[in-house]
Design a protein with these regions (language model features):
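Glycine-rich beta-strand-centered segment in the early N-terminal region that forms part
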Residues: 19-36, 46-86
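Local beta-strand N-terminus motif with an aromatic residue
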Residues: 77, 89, 188-190
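Residue-level detector of alpha-helix initiation sites
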Residues: 115, 144-149
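Adenosine-nucleotide cofactor-binding segment
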Residues: 134-143, 151-202
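Glycine-rich phosphate-binding loop and adjacent beta-alpha segment
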Residues: 199-259, 298-300
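C-terminal hydrophobic helical "lid"/dimerization subdomain
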Residues: 247-300
Length: 300
């Protein structure tokens, strides 16, 4: 089956065609309806990070068009949110645990970025529960989309007192309220989510004994004085969608959107038509004008 897709050539996405194979018995075929344009994909054009082939276009919503013989959780015509790296294809194949059934076909259910946010906790669940019982301080470095999901889930799902949470950044004041700080409050923190990639927790004495450091953004190489970490028994974790807990996070993402615990609408600024406006989704996403968050591409 010949299928259109986007391919990065000389750090610009170009439209081309490939031969999509038929599904295996543990796969479904999906017709694309919405795809979020992620920061990772924009880095193809920025040329800020090396990009592996076939590793983009993974924030998707679509309609099931074929079902493998061993698939029992969805049927043809169902709507799904997927995490498959499908190259912005018109149709693509999706493996078990790379999709979840969703109640309606809407960009609200572009779940992959929400699942990535939840996975910061899910992948570290046992350690998180242990430290959260102590009711110590929690630091979130960054105030964008991921931080918003984290803060909402911490306060609404895990009943964390907002007074225990310190968010460093300058965005989404209406979400963080008094928890938002422009500069780093110097305390000893039990749990730190580093979403900025500045290596701040490794170059400042802010980690408590037996603390948990979750690194959610890659930083530049930095010389670190290990005396800051010595004898503190710090657990450092690098969450990833490749972790076996990610499917759990994907299901949780569907639940918190469906129950309106978290509302993603304000973060999707604009949709662009696949056939006539797709280049604008990338060019505007790169330039990121004021009050612009994220764009997505709409298939007919």
């Amino acid at each position: 089956m010949k299928v259109r897709y986007f391919h990065p050539i000389n750090n610009v996405f170009e439209e081309t065609v490939w031969d999509k194979p038929d599904i295996k018995n543990t796969e479904i075929e999906v017709k694309t309806k919405y795809v979020g344009v992620s920061n990772n994909d924009l880095n193809v054009i920025y040329n800020q990070t090396p990009y592996a082939s076939n590793k983009y276009g993974c924030e998707s919503v679509g309609i099931v068009t074929k079902v493998g013989s061993k698939i029992t959780d969805v049927k043809v015509g169902d709507f799904v949110a997927t995490t498959t790296n499908h190259l912005y294809s018109d149709f693509y194949n999706c493996k078990t645990e790379e999709y979840v059934k969703i109640p309606k076909c809407s960009p609200r259910y572009i779940l992959e970025p929400i699942a990535r946010s939840l996975n910061l906790i899910t992948q570290n669940w046992n350690k998180f529960v242990e430290l959260n019982r102590n009711e110590g301080k929690i630091l979130i470095l960054g105030s964008g989309f991921v931080a918003s999901v984290l803060y909402t889930v911490l306060t609404k799902e895990h009943d964390v007192d907002p007074n225990r949470i310190y968010v460093v950044g300058s965005h989404n004041k209406s979400i963080f309220n008094k928890s938002l700080y422009n500069t780093l409050p110097i305390h000893l923190y039990d749990i730190v989510f580093d979403l900025q990639g500045l290596n701040t927790p490794l170059t400042n004495n802010i980690l408590n004994t037996n603390s948990l450091l979750i690194i959610g953004a890659a930083g530049k190489p930095t010389l670190i004085d290990l005396n800051l970490l010595a004898h503190k028994s710090v657990t450092i974790n690098f969450p990833s969608p490749d972790n076996n807990k990610f499917y759990e996070s994907l299901n949780d993402a569907c639940r918190i959107v469906e129950t309106k615990i978290f509302d993603p609408n304000k973060f999707w600024t604009k949709g662009y038509k696949r056939d006539t406006e797709w280049k604008s989704a990338f060019s505007i996403g790169i330039n990121r004008p004021k009050h612009y968050n994220y764009g997505y591409i709409i298939w007919n």
